[in-house]
């Protein structure tokens, strides 16, 4: 079940609540497009939300609701073992990276926690409501692709050590045991 990328949103909306899957409405379609633009698809990432159920009247998540759901998110995190986590939106940012700053200030920056890169991004729904955020969101996803390319690239092969001519000379003929001390 591991995935290199984990995407964490805020809470299920109406469509997500009906279908029981995260990001299936208009914001989900935009998320699919953003993923495709960086060569990823839903089956290559793990998508979830801070809240596991829809807040009444689609209101913002309350702090106590988020706290109640965090053990489930932590369990998902342990199972998935991501290399990068996209933190979508202000509410997810406040729960996952408290105190780092506002989403408008820190989106697109990487924050390393326990060897995992967390990157806050605007929520796709915010970009649907405010089209000026779409370019920022696309650039942030491009940064994730660059990060993954660096992290997942096979390591450069070690250069062959230079062998000194003396080391390649044939050993002495005597069968004498040499001492290490």
Provide a role label for each language-model segment.
Residues 1-181:
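A polyanion-binding, active-site-adjacent surface
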